[in-house]
Amino acid sequence: MILLRHGESVWNLENRFTGWTDVDLSANGVEEARLAGKILKNEGYQFDKAYTSVLKRAIRTLWIVEEMMDLVWLPVEKRWELNERHYGNLQGLNKAEMAKQYGAELVHQWRRGYGIEPPPLDNSDPRHPRFDRRYAGLAPEALPASESLKKTLKRVIPCWKQHILPDIAAGKELIIVAHGNSLRALYKHLEGLSDQEVMELNIPTGIPLVFELDSAFRPTAHYYLADSEKSQVVIGDTAH
């Protein structure tokens, strides 16, 4: 199984909180996706199905990977549950500016804390997902106005158990293209990380992460498909 965080987005580049805002890839993000596809092809990976979110930066990353691997026919299941963590009223705001306004420690807790939710969107805010057509079929109470990583986990893990895991059990080779925090949530579940340990975990953009699973679907190994020097550089910190 391959986990892949989308390539760098325009708002990653601008150091903004992104969350559910549907921003596109930056030029560098497109190149990251192309490189990921090239690496996967060169390593001989083949897939039977792909999962992604309903946000274009993840979808476009998957498109590019498929094209690079000559897998444009690949069945794709788009799941809103794989969306990035919702950053509430912080979405669109610059993190450095927020640190000056609210203090670096509070902003760090908003970003990396496990159970802390950023200030929520008002229900009348046009940025609220209730006004977005792609979520029209969901119950209003399912749509977040803000999320902690803990809350994100509560939608990602049911998606894993109800949709992704049955495909793995059926013998399908999968690629999951999603977001920093939805992948952190899945990583926490798979590896049994503590709440404190997951706070220190960062998933870099555009680098394929391999998870090898045993017959009981427990991880036996995980590793990035990239040279160690690049991994060390990008794993440090990337805006969400």
UniProtKB/Swiss-Prot annotation:
SUPFAM superfamilies: Phosphoglycerate mutase-like. Pathway: Carbohydrate degradation; glycolysis; pyruvate from D-glyceraldehyde 3-phosphate: step 3/5. It catalyses: (2R)-2-phosphoglycerate = (2R)-3-phosphoglycerate. One of its GO terms (molecular function) is phosphoglycerate mutase activity. InterPro entries: His_Pase_superF_clade-1, His_PPase_superfam, PG/BPGM_mutase_AS, Phosphogly_mut1. Its EC number is 5.4.2.11. Belongs to the phosphoglycerate mutase family. BPG-dependent PGAM subfamily. Catalyzes the interconversion of 2-phosphoglycerate and 3-phosphoglycerate. NCBIfam families: pgm_1, PRK14115.1. This is 2,3-bisphosphoglycerate-dependent phosphoglycerate mutase. It comes from Nitrosococcus oceani (strain ATCC 19707 / BCRC 17464 / JCM 30415 / NCIMB 11848 / C-107). The gene is gpmA.
